[in-house]
UniProtKB/Swiss-Prot annotation:
Family: Belongs to the class-I aminoacyl-tRNA synthetase family. ValS type 1 subfamily.
Domain topic, free-text comment: ValRS has two distinct active sites: one for aminoacylation and one for editing. The misactivated threonine is translocated from the active site to the editing site.
UniProt GO BP: valyl-tRNA aminoacylation
Organism: Corynebacterium jeikeium (strain K411)
Coiled-coil blocks: 863-929
Chain span(s) of sequence motif 'KMSKS' region: 568-572
Underlying gene: valS
Pfam families registered for this protein in UniProt: Anticodon_1, tRNA-synt_1, Val_tRNA-synt_C
Top EC class of this enzyme: ligase
Subunit structure: Monomer.
Protein name: Valine--tRNA ligase
Length: 932
């Protein structure tokens, strides 16, 4: 047919073997490149390795492209990916992939943390189990060697998991907090701080782990409500007429360290006692002075509190205010020591019981309350109750550093997203206590301090020669893991050396992490970065208006991943989810899209199996839709003249551009949920469910018998299909890299001007979506009318008991509603046949549209089995009634309403509303059925 030959020329078809024999005139069927079904496990590993081998993820500091850089929050070297990591990595990877597509030179720098306590504890436990030895049996050097062996053997797990979920990091730049370069940076920073007078050694209160025998940080202390006993002890005379006070404690054993009793200065009950002394029950040489202090709450208990300055942080503060002695009554293992009493050598819990019994014998136990539930801090690693304990440790003086950190946010040099987290930042940095940086461990950065035989203290930098000779020795402690982590943004790029990486990529563009470590990690990075900038401006540069350089321009704080009921994931609840299980069961894209679709700045993210299945189904939907489009000739190419396109063509292109703009705006604000939810709704609800269905009508089923106009329309539809698919796959690539890469390669394979991979393809702009055209309001209106008409007719068919596959003769006036061009599409979408002469109306419906109310008459005779329909409806009615009963039962339970999360209650109310509507609809339908 001549007209087809001319159109093939217009379509620029290079496949000369393609013939107009009823086949697709565009050329070979590209869908043949795709297997019958989407199987992520079959392609993900090879796709990822191909990206790595092609060097797509490598950063070039000599590039002229604008820089975009992120440093990966370093996971524990022997750790495994948990859902919090998976969220972190998904969001960072989405940012990195999008920025590459936007033409940035991207550095996403990976690495891992030596994780002092976590790693040492794990290795010690393994050695105890396998060899029956502890670290002291080996000695320091041999034990550290064992830890390195463990790290080398088990340290690659999380890296393999990162590859499995698609992290586009530059593996050639992977760092470790104990590698030579970072060790040099740590020693340099310690020396700089020490020389500036910001590092000092002192006796201070710390969280002490008797099992680990080290101080631990606040973040490594987990609080839980424990059952204990509240014991009231009488100090002073046993005669009521003589001076005495009653104090209460849950830690009876600490009374061996009591040096005073505190009361409120305005508490008249104790006015005469203030300044007097009370004898200690077990230590006759110790007199406990009664002091007045505003800390005491006169309304709580007896209004008097015991003061144990060396074993309670609040008591320590009072001890400093009143210049009290601070005897430490417990050794590193949690045993009573150096009290000169019969209790020395007892483990703390044994001593608690023995001391209580001894006090009872003296008649000093006034009351016992058991069980008494109170909050107790436990070591996250060793699980035992932490002991507040006065200990000589190394500290960083934070006042100056904290001020610079606060100023960095106040000035806008670094911006926190969401801004609602700013008050928490200022609460911490404006009221920060000096930071204990020493740990009594062997695995880590050893403190670079040497002590001489005559009391000398020497701090050595990496290029200094450590003092040697008789009597000289290095400090035994190591630095808190957070010390080296605080240097991460710039030490990983070569500081303290001046490097091309620092010049190109520092400060980093954005830090992505959870709000729960805003203080523990983020604030400390800000402190060290601003300090380093101030002292080495020639390396790190200077910030705006001469202020210290910040380590990251933006701080994006996401929430915690919770279970589908909003509960924190924990071993005790058994509600934890291993992200690698989802990768195995649903594919990496399903995991990533579930997390990206739910992630908003600062908000917690509830996830469950249903969400993962939904994301898996979305990937499958994309796959099947692309395969169908390719089978029908979808291809990339120049858009035809806009006036030649159908309303549906213009509508889908304009909607694509609207969604593109929304996605760009949302991602620029780190609103991943908004961006991906809109992509999901557009791709599934508008492109797959609507435009693809209309495209089936616009593309000829038999090209041989098609008119010239139908062939032209079909070819234009194929190009629009290709254009929309091209853009949708690009927009979804940051969140779903594997399925989009697979489909995009099938769509663009061999096309001139297209890159080999989506990783390096251009990010969509208006030119790529709808050619930069203005939205066609008439097309939008008509498509909205088609949407409403089809939806109402489908619902009406269902209400009439017509099976979805059953074609029904129908009369309706499309011209009156300005939908004449959509008659074929609507009839196809609703399965309506053109009526014959013997048409007999059995049902009708009126649908109000924008231009007119359209009347539709249907002939359903012979299409409905009344008895079967009645049985089906009665079954559905019973199901709706059951749902209503269940909802009413739950919503009528006051105990349930008080405990259930608001989202759960809202979900039940919504199901109740839907069930009520369903009940009423089915009832009406049953009443309308012909009587038997």
């Amino acid at each position: 047919m001549p007209c087809l030959a001319r159109l093939l020329d217009l379509a620029d078809v290079s496949d000369s073997s393609s013939k107009a024999n009823g086949s697709n005139p565009i050329g070979a069927d590209r869908s043949a490149q795709l297997p019958a079904a989407w199987d992520p496990a079959a392609v993900e590993e090879n796709l990822y390795q191909g990206w790595v081998d092609s060097g797509y993820f490598k950063a070039d500091p000599s590039s002229d492209k604008p820089p975009f850089s992120i440093v990966l929050p370093p996971p524990n070297v022997t750790g495994q990916l948990h859902m919090g990591h998976a969220l972190d990595h998904t969001l960072m990877d989405a940012m990195a992939r999008r920025k590459r597509m936007q033409g940035f030179e991207v550095l996403w720098l990976p690495g891992s943390d030596h994780a002092g306590i976590a790693t040492q504890t794990k290795v010690e436990a393994n050695l105890k189990e396998t060899e029956g030895k502890d670290r002291f049996d080996y000695g320091r050097d041999a034990f550290v060697g064992k830890v390195w062996e463990w790290k080398d053997r088990y340290g690659g797990v999380i890296q393999r998991q990162m590859r499995a979920i698609g992290d586009s990091v530059d593996w050639s730049r992977e760092r470790f907090t104990l590698d030579d370069g970072l060790s040099r940076a740590v020693q340099t920073m310690f020396k700089e701080l020490f020389d500036a007078g910001l590092i000092y050694r002192a006796n201070r209160m710390v969280n002490w782990s008797p099992v680990l025998q080290t101080a631990i940080s606040d973040i490594e202390v987990v609080y839980s409500d424990d059952e204990g006993e509240l014991v009231s002890i009488r100090y002073g005379s046993l005669e009521d007429s003589e001076p005495h006070v009653v104090v209460a404690t849950t830690r009876v054993e600490t009374m061996l360290g009591d040096v005073a009793v505190a009361v409120h200065p305005e508490d008249e009950r104790y006015t005469d006692l203030v300044g007097k002394s009370l004898p200690h029950p077990f230590l006759p040489d110790r007199q406990m002075i009664v002091v007045a202090d505003d800390y005491v709450d006169p309304e709580f208990g007896t209004g008097a509190v015991k003061i144990t300055p060396a074993h309670d942080p609040n008591d320590f503060a009072m001890g400093q205010r009143h210049d009290l002695p601070m005897p430490v009554i417990m050794d590193e293992t949690g045993h009573i020591a150096n009290t000169g009493t019969e209790f020395d050598g007892m483990e703390r819990y044994e001593a608690r019981e023995k001391i209580r019994l001894a006090l009872e014998e003296q008649g000093r136990i006034v009351a016992r309350k058991f069980p008494y539930v109170h909050s107790v801090g436990h070591s996250e690693r060793s699980k035992e109750a932490v002991e507040p304990r006065l200990s000589e440790q190394w500290f960083v003086k934070v006042e100056e550093l904290a001020k610079m950190s606060g100023d960095a946010i106040r000035s806008g040099d670094s911006v926190i997203h969401p801004s609602s987290q700013e008050p928490r930042w200022f609460d911490w940095v404006d009221d920060m206590h000096d930071w204990c940086i020493s740990r009594q461990l062997w695995w880590g950065h050893r403190i670079p301090i040497w002590y001489g035989p005559n009391g000398e203290i020497v701090c050595c930098g990496p290029d200094d020669e450590a003092p040697t000779g008789e009597g000289w020795y290095q400090d035994e402690d190591v630095l808190d893991t957070w010390f080296s982590s605080a240097l991460w943004p710039f030490s990983t790029m070569g500081w303290p050396e001046k490097t091309p990486e620092l010049e190109k990529f520092y400060p980093t563009s954005v830090l992505v992490t959870g709000y729960d470590i805003l203080f523990f990690w983020v604030a400390r990075m800000m402190m060290f970065a601003t300090f380093a900038s101030k002292h080495t401006p020639e390396i790190l540069g200077t910030g705006k208006d001469g202020r210290p350089q910040i380590p990251f321009n933006d701080i994006f704080l996401h929430g915690l991943v919770r279970d589908e009921h909003g509960r924190k994931m924990s071993k005790s609840l058994g509600n934890g989810i291993d992200p690698m299980d989802w990768v195995r069961d649903y594919g990496a894209d399903a995991l990533r899209f579930t997390l990206a679709r739910g992630a908003n700045p600062g908000s917690d993210l509830p996830v469950g199996e249903d969400a993962a299945q939904s994301s898996r189904n979305f990937a499958t939907k994309l796959y099947n839709a692309t395969k169908f489009a390719l089978m029908n000739g979808a291809r990339v190419g120049e858009l035809p003249a806009r006036e030649t396109l159908t309303d549906a063509d213009r509508w889908i292109l304009d909607r694509l551009e609207e969604v593109r703009q929304l996605v760009d705006d949302a991602l620029d604000r780190y609103e991943f949920s908004l961006a991906n939810e809109n992509l999901y709704r557009f791709a599934w609800g508008e492109f797959c469910d609507w435009y693809l269905e209309i495209a089936k009508v616009q593309i000829p089923r038999d090209w041989d018998s098609a008119t010239e106009e139908q062939v032209q329309r079909g070819i234009r539809t194929q190009i629009v299909l290709g254009r929309v698919l091209d853009s949708v796959l690009r927009l979804l690539h940051p969140a779903m890299p594997f399925v989009t890469e697979t489909l995009w390669k099938a769509l663009t394979d061999g096309e001139e001007g297209y890159s080999e991979s989506l990783v390096t393809a251009d990010w969509p702009t208006a030119d790529l979506t709808n050619g930069g055209a203005q939205t066609d309001a008439d097309a939008v209106r008509r498509m909205a009318d088609v949407d409403k008409l089809v939806t109402e007719l489908r619902r009406f068919r269902s209400d009439q008991g017509v099976k979805p596959s059953q074609k029904v003769p129908a009369k309706l006036d499309f011209a009156a509603a300005d939908l004449a061009n959509f008659e074929e599409a609507v009839r196809s979408l609703v399965r309506l046949e053109t009526p014959e002469e013997d048409f007999a109306e059995t049902a009708s419906i009126e649908v109000r549209l924008s231009q007119a109310t359209i009347a539709v008459q249907l002939d359903t005779s012979g299409t409905v089995d009344v008895a079967a329909e009645r049985k089906r409806l009665e079954k559905d009615l019973a199901a709706a009634q059951k749902e209503l009963d269940n909802a009413a039962k739950k919503l009528g339970n006051e105990n349930f309403l008080a405990k259930a999360p608001e989202k759960v209650v809202e979900g039940i109310r919504e199901r109740q509303r839907v069930a009520q509507e369903e009940f009423e609809r089915i009832t009406a339908r049953l009443e309308g059925l012909p009587k038997a």
